[in-house]
Amino acid sequence: MTPFTQHTGLVAPLDRANVDTDQIIPKQFLKSIKRTGFGPNLFDEWRYLDIGEPGRDNSTRPLNPEFVLNFPRYQGASVLLARENFGCGSSREHAPWALDEYGFRTVIAPSFADIFYNNSFKNGLLPIVLAEAQVDALFEQCLATEGYQLTVDLAAQRVRRPDGVEYGFDIDAFRKHCLLNGLDDIGLTLQDADAIGRFEQGHRARQPWLFGALQ
């Protein structure tokens, strides 16, 4: 998992509340258990004018000119600005996978659905909760300023606007540690690889009959 320390990126404003996981990545794309291949179908039903199908070449599909991520000014955005209850609906880890593969490093909103919030941390996507008035101010500036960027400093737990105004945000210490060091569940486990190896050797010595049956 890519470490998250400090990130400055172009902001895309998704001015919709209660965006659910089926809108983030529609159900027909969930057949794959791989973590890749979902970015092109992020917000599929909003980005395109037709119905998407797995394996289809998206480069030939008609884009919805009214959807924010299709606006030329937001191409290359890596910070998603959203409204309350982002990521509600069914539990699907594919949602943060799709956001991450599209290029988003962080999502800023007044609130998130609990399961999506937890899944995001496990997949290197930083969900930031700010006060609604602060999010309103960011939307106002973003919509008024082409090329609007924000800087997110995870170590300091601050979001910095171009005018120097900063907003603090809360994050669990363990989740912060994992993001700063690029540790997902597998990475955390591998930190104890030596101890696990010693346990397996001892277990094999104590109960060799168990391992003999597997040979």
Curated annotation (Swiss-Prot):
Name of the featured protein: 3-isopropylmalate dehydratase small subunit
Organism listed in the record: Xanthomonas euvesicatoria pv. vesicatoria (strain 85-10) (Xanthomonas campestris pv. vesicatoria)
Functional note: Catalyzes the isomerization between 2-isopropylmalate and 3-isopropylmalate, via the formation of 2-isopropylmaleate.
Lineage: superkingdom: Bacteria
Reactions that this protein is recorded to catalyse: (2R,3S)-3-isopropylmalate = (2S)-2-isopropylmalate
GO biological process, one term: L-leucine biosynthetic process
Entry GO terms, CC: 3-isopropylmalate dehydratase complex
UniProt EC number: 4.2.1.33
Pfam families xref list: Aconitase_C
Oligomer status and interactors: Heterodimer of LeuC and LeuD.
Keywords: Amino-acid biosynthesis, Branched-chain amino acid biosynthesis, Leucine biosynthesis, Lyase
Pathway(s) per entry: Amino-acid biosynthesis; L-leucine biosynthesis; L-leucine from 3-methyl-2-oxobutanoate: step 2/4
Species classification: Bacteria, Pseudomonadati, Pseudomonadota, Gammaproteobacteria, Lysobacterales
GO molecular function list: 3-isopropylmalate dehydratase activity
SUPFAM superfamilies: LeuD/IlvD-like
The keyword Calcium appears for this protein: no
InterPro entries given in the database record: 3-IsopropMal_deHydase_ssu, Aconitase/3IPM_dehydase_swvl, AconitaseA/IPMdHydase_ssu_swvl, IPMI_Swivel, LeuD
Keyword flag Lyase: yes
Family to which this protein belongs: Belongs to the LeuD family. LeuD type 1 subfamily.
